Curated annotation (Swiss-Prot):
Keywords on record: Cytoplasm, Leucine-rich repeat, Phosphoprotein, Repeat, Ubl conjugation pathway
Modified residues (Phosphothreonine): 417
Protein name per Swiss-Prot or TrEMBL: F-box/LRR-repeat protein 20
Organism lineage string: Eukaryota, Metazoa, Chordata, Craniata, Vertebrata
Family matches, as CDD domains: F-box_FBXL2-like
Subunit architecture: Interacts with SKP1 and CUL1.
GO biological process, alphabetically ordered: behavioral fear response; regulation of protein catabolic process at presynapse, modulating synaptic transmission; regulation of synaptic vesicle exocytosis; SCF-dependent proteasomal ubiquitin-dependent protein catabolic process
Organism name: Homo sapiens
Start-end of each LRR repeat: 74-100, 101-126, 127-152, 153-178, 179-204, 205-230, 231-256, 257-282, 283-308, 309-334, 335-363, 364-388, 389-414
Localisation per UniProt entry: Cytoplasm
Length: 436
């Protein structure tokens, strides 16, 4: 808030007179002022630091800078800024996000690692100047590191994973998505020193083979989350070892791993009863047989992405409706064998009334307005995708809205085709995206 005083615009912080500030400082002990300042964000702290010398000292006290997120300032953050922050915060800093800060490189992060040895959570997602040298620094100075995000740091190699293994034994969560130089050798080195890993994001690590998963399955019994999206070389052999070695697994993304078959679903059903999230989009070899085993054994499923699992039929939906009462999000996009009958079972199932929030049915050509009738009793339903469902009508959507007035319906409808022009030119036809 800014106020005009004698023609001069001043911020609320600048409106404090010396006497006002002196009263506050006199009435409240330093410890209490520090406690108040600890609730302020980075921008507000910097503003407070400009009020007076006393507040400058309080605002810039290292204890107020335990958690810093610089994403909103990513274009302005250069290495020297990180170095200055590290010198000011020192051992107080526990969590730092430099996501998207393209100007930050190895030298600045070495200074940071030397000064902030109690760091526990570090996000370097998209810091493309980062190389193995940064992980070497973290290994040398930051032994308390628990969460590290190196996604899209494409210069990272197996050497980084070896360094982390040697110096960061408490590591629980690591994201090296799109670090496509990483191979099974790096994974082997990592898991031997970081056996407490709970979350591992390997999306787009296209060189990884089944051997890498065997190392994970053998050394990471605490693993809860694993993302293998578009790891194209992965097969049943590798994923089965994960299922057998990681019984606490709750979230698995294998979207784009087109080599996997029902053997994976059987292994998950037999070994991972706590599974909550399964993403297997574009895994076209999966069938009703595998999903039947999965549904009958994994009753805690909450989110399933089955996009382009083109072999599944209503049988899968029947099993989910019976055995998965917690299901909240279900994607069936491009599952062209799904019919109104499957949606009827889902709408009458255990998850329907209080749990189901999102269902994606785009490009399911057999779905009609009858499916919308079956879903009207799903009172928690927030969004439904109906793009390119040619048998869905505006009238059907309108009827659904009478029962679920707050639902977001996404659908395509072709506009009315205009009459031929007098000049006889070729008729044009367009499809418009209408967000209903």
């Amino acid at each position: 808030m800014r106020r005009d005083v004698n023609g001069v615009t001043k911020s609320r912080f600048e409106m404090f007179s010396n006497s006002d500030e002196a009263v506050i400082n006199k009435k409240l002990p330093k410890e209490l002022l520090l406690r108040i300042f600890s609730f302020l964000d980075v921008v507000t702290l910097c503003r407070c630091a400009q009020v007076s010398r006393a507040w400058n000292v309080l605002a810039l006290d290292g204890s107020n800078w335990q958690r810093i997120d610089l994403f909103d300032f990513q274009r302005d953050i250069e290495g020297r800024v990180v170095e200055n922050i590290s010198k000011r915060c020192g051992g107080f800093l526990r969590k730092l996000s430099l996501r998207g800060c393209l100007g930050v490189g190895d030298n600045a992060l070495r200074t940071f690692a030397q000064n902030c040895r109690n760091i526990e959570v570090l996000n370097l997602n998209g810091c493309t100047k980062t190389t193995d040298a940064t992980c070497t620094s973290l290994s040398k100075f930051c032994s308390k590191l628990r969460h590290l995000d190196l996604a899209s740091c494409t210069s990272i190699t197996n050497m980084s994973l070896k360094a982390l293994s040697e110096g960061c034994p408490l590591l629980e969560q690591l994201n090296i998505s799109w670090c496509d130089q990483v191979t099974k050798d790096g994974i082997q080195a990592l898991v031997r020193g970081c056996g407490g890993l709970k979350a591992l994001f390997l999306k787009g690590c296209t060189q990884l083979e089944d051997e890498a998963l065997k190392y994970i399955g053998a050394h990471c019994p605490e693993l809860v989350t694993l993302n293998l999206q578009t790891c194209l070389q992965i097969t049943d052999e590798g994923l089965i070892t994960i299922c057998r070695g990681c019984h606490k697994l709750q979230s698995l993304c294998a979207s784009g791993c087109s080599n996997i078959t029902d053997a994976i679903l059987n292994a998950l059903g037999q070994n991972c009863p706590r599974l909550r999230i399964l993403e297997v989009a574009r895994c076209s070899q999966l069938t009703d047989v595998g999903f039947t085993t999965l549904a009958r054994n994994c009753h805690e499923l909450e989110k399933m992405d089955l996009e382009e699992c083109v072999q599944i039929t209503d049988s899968t939906l029947i099993q989910l409706s019976i055995h998965c009462p917690r299901l909240q999000v279900l994607s069936l996009s491009h599952c062209e064998l799904i019919t109104d009958d499957g949606i009827r079972h889902l709408g009458n199932g255990a998850c329907a009334h209080d749990q189901l929030e999102v269902i994606e049915l785009d490009n399911c050509p057999l779905i009609t307005d009858a499916s919308l009738e079956h879903l009207k009793s799903c009172h928690s339903l927030e969004r439904i995708e109906l793009y390119d469902c040619q048998q869905i009508t505006r009238a059907g959507i309108k009827r659904l809205r009478t029962h679920l007035p707050n639902i977001k319906v996404h659908a395509y409808f072709a506009p009315v085709t205009p009459p031929p022009s007098v000049g006889g030119s070729r008729q044009r036809f367009c499809r418009c995206c209408i967000i209903l």
